[in-house]
Amino acid sequence: MRKKRIGLLFGMEDTFPWALIEAINRRGGHDVEAMPVEISYIKDDRTFDYDVVLDRISHEVPFYRTWLKCAMASGVRIINNPIWWSADDKFFDNLVAQSVRVAVPRTVLLPHKRYPPNTEAKSFRNMRWVNWDEVFAYLGFPIFLKPAHGGGWKDVYKCNSAEEFFAAYDQTRDLAMMAQEAIEFDSYFRCYVVGRKRVHLMRYDPK
């Protein structure tokens, strides 16, 4: 009987992937083996050498996202679900959380600082000037300025004043950004959900 194969798809990080591979192989015995995923090109014959793939990098590599979706369509179990990446919109996620009475920080979605590719002034004739005084009064300081899409702590700024805010906003290029009330916390947790059934809470230090 063939061993179950668990592949890890990862990028620049070195510590976690190799430690996880070692831990899985130590515990898996004769039934399971873990290894780095190896990809060259993708054929449409739905042939994949893995039973499970743990994804740590596809949010940064579109080619990997497509590979993962093809693997999932072929029966490979993917963690995390690559389809959810297309729903990775922090502002919308906040609204969903509010709808089920989860407390979230006050948040404002902001226009792009610069024109996105293939747009010009006429592309934004529906836009009106932002009343920054209203935004700052609604959120208070300090404010976190962060991209509305994606993660990895990229392009995240903590702003203690309007001057700091505008200096940070000027650096955001054509990203869709959101401004968020800063919450001073006593404890910080990350919640991991597997298969929509198993939930694991972990203490985490975002600093």
Question: Where would I find each of the regions flagged by the language model?
Answer:
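Short, solvent-exposed loop/turn segments at secondary-structure junctions
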Residues: 13-15, 59-60, 85, 150-151, ...
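Beta-strand scaffold of nucleotide-dependent catalytic cores
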Residues: 168, 180, 188-205
